[in-house]
Amino acid sequence: MAKLNLAFYTSIARNMNMLLVRGYDRNGQRIQEKIRYRPTFYLEAKDSSKAKFKGLDGTPVEPMVFDSMSDSRKFVETYKDVPSFKIYGNDRHIPAFIYSQFPLSIQYQQSLIRICTLDIEIRKEAWGYSDAFEAKNPIIAITVKCSTDNTCHTWGLKPYDPSIALTSRYTIDYRQFKTEGQMLEDFLRWWIHPDNSPDIITGWNTRAFDIPYLINRLIKLGGEEASRVLSPWNIIESKEVKLKGRMQTMYELVGIQQLDYMDL
């Protein structure tokens, strides 16, 4: 396949027969593309004298290109129990795609990567706080600080008093709203703008609390469609993980990496 004008990637995910690629080109501009990846496997060459490639065991091989990743999987399944039929190549499609684009080293430019620290605050009710899955308490404030600028973006329901700020290091962009729904709607409009979309989300306990709470609160107020826009591909994947002795649902915002301080 032809190479993308991709200097480096920040996320590659698979969705059916497509690879969802995000990164930056050689001019420092963000790239976000869906690629129909056609995998290549290698079979023992019919004429070894004309073979241009060899397997790691020295066997002369020739390429076989598939129309889709699912076709390649079906091919492997068909011949997996035939001992004399050996298939060479990498059936892990994302690493294979990465190597096709970057056969040598990858030169990352860290200053371009948009790393955003996320923190939410929820209102305490008379009965206390709910967990991230139930998300019963209203969100009363959201703050995002990204590495590519010096601005703290905060959405809140109460007035902001600059005189009690603990630091003057950052420019404060504070937006006050009458209702939680209005606040979340404005936050999502800001989040999905191409200039604001993160490459990486970080923060304290964001994987177990902030992200799942925000997703589940959005689902309560606006349905799953509202929550999906947190992903640049509108795809959110969930998985069950054991945390502190109990199972908990965590979410992947496809296209955005998560680096929780608690995991580092």
Regions flagged by a language model, labelled:
Residues 1-264:
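The two-metal-ion catalytic cores of nucleic-acid processing enzymes
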